Each structure stands twice: as C-alpha cells, then as structure tokens.
Amino acid sequence: MQLTPREIEKLMVYTLADVALKRKSRGLKLNYPEAVAIITAAALEGAREGKTLEEVMDDSRHVLTKEDVMDGVADLIPHVQVEAIFTDGSRLVTVHDPIQ
C-alpha cells in the first residue's frame, strides 16, 4: 500500500486518538499528545461527515474537559490547527481553547 506523507500523518493521528480514547474510557487522564490527537481526529471526522467549518470548530471545542487531561495540559493547548477536507474543499480548522 502506497500512502502519501499526509495520509501517514492522518493515520498516526487516528491511531493515537484511538489509543487515547481507550485510556480515557478506563479513567486515565490524558497527556498533551493524546489530547491534541483526540481534538484533531474530531475535527477531521466532523469535516468528513459533511459538517460546516463552524460546526466542526464548535464540536471539536467540546470533546475534552479539564477533568479529562493531566494537570497543566489544558494550558499548553491554546489552539489546535489541522487542514481538513470538507465537501467543498480543503480548509484550515482552528479550534481555539479546545479544552474547556
């Protein structure tokens, strides 16, 4: 199977997000890479589902809470940016204050 660097990166994001969600379901607090992966995967999936840019940004902002992450992690993530493919083309999604 031949994958482009962008496809490999997305695959890594989805894999880490999957591992992180399993850890979260077991009650473990998430670290920085895990939190970013979950937020990023939520944005990519929202775009894939046909949501608007605004819907994706809003939905991705409510995926995690401060209780889901280790102390200080929320402060380390002022925003998350990812290029997502929407039904009308590729757009940069910026999720401000992603952990409430």
Curated annotation (Swiss-Prot):
The keyword Protein biosynthesis does not apply. Its main location: cytoplasm. The keyword Cytoplasm applies. It is found in: Cytoplasm. It holds the Pfam family Urease_gamma. It catalyses: urea + 2 H2O + H(+) = hydrogencarbonate + 2 NH4(+). Pathway: Nitrogen metabolism; urea degradation; CO(2) and NH(3) from urea (urease route): step 1/1. One of its GO terms (biological process) is urea catabolic process. One of its GO terms (molecular function) is urease activity. One of its GO terms (cellular component) is cytoplasm. It comes from the Bacteria. Transmembrane segments: none annotated. Keywords: Cytoplasm, Hydrolase. Its EC number is 3.5.1.5. Heterotrimer of UreA (gamma), UreB (beta) and UreC (alpha) subunits. Three heterotrimers associate to form the active enzyme. Belongs to the urease gamma subunit family. This is Urease subunit gamma. It comes from Photorhabdus laumondii subsp. laumondii (strain DSM 15139 / CIP 105565 / TT01). The gene is ureA.
